[in-house]
């Protein structure tokens, strides 16, 4: 963990990503970046903007802007100040559809080790 913090302070670009199941281990990786001394807001940039930049797709991904593609995760809390808020997903929006994370877990037979946020009334129409 200390080495990651040292690399970040030295200006080495960091990318977030794992070889495991998407979501679960990535959340933990981002928490470890915060433990390494990187602010939660900067960790979110590493997980989004940096990935798009170094994958060569920054023109249409990596940030929320008009004309860019985006999948969104709405969480309970503010992950720019508390990275563990990423574990409290309320709604995931992908390809213009909203998905309740708890239903995905149930349908896949997964018992989540993350907490879903209280259900909000939502409508994307």
Locate predicted features.
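Extracellular/periplasmic ectodomains of large secreted or surface enzymes and adhesion receptors
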Residues: 5-8, 91, 95-125
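Residues that scaffold the ATP/ADP-binding catalytic core of kinase and kinase-like folds
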Residues: 54, 83, 101
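His/acidic/aromatic-lined binding-pocket segments of jelly-roll/cupin-type domains
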Residues: 72-73, 90-92
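His/Asp/Glu-enriched, well-ordered alpha-helical/loop segment
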Residues: 1-78, 98
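Short, surface-exposed secondary-structure edge patches
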Residues: 61-64, 83, 90
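Structured helix-beta-strand junction loops
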Residues: 10-11, 86-89
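Short amphipathic alpha-helical segments
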Residues: 28-29, 85-87, 105
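Short, Lys/Arg- and Gly-enriched loop/turn segments at beta-strand edges
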Residues: 79-85
């Amino acid at each position: 963990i200390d080495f990651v913090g040292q690399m970040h302070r030295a200006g080495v670009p960091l990318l977030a990503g794992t070889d495991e199941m998407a979501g679960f281990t990535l959340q933990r990786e981002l928490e470890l970046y915060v433990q390494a001394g990187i602010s939660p807001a900067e960790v979110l940039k590493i997980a989004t903007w940096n990935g798009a930049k170094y994958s060569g797709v920054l023109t249409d991904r990596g940030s929320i802007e008009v004309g860019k593609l985006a999948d969104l995760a709405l969480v309970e809390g503010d992950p720019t100040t508390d990275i563990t808020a990423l574990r409290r997903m309320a709604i995931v929006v992908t390809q213009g559809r909203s998905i309740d994370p708890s239903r995905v877990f149930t349908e896949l037979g997964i018992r989540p080790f993350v907490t879903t946020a209280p259900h909000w009334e939502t409508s994307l129409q």
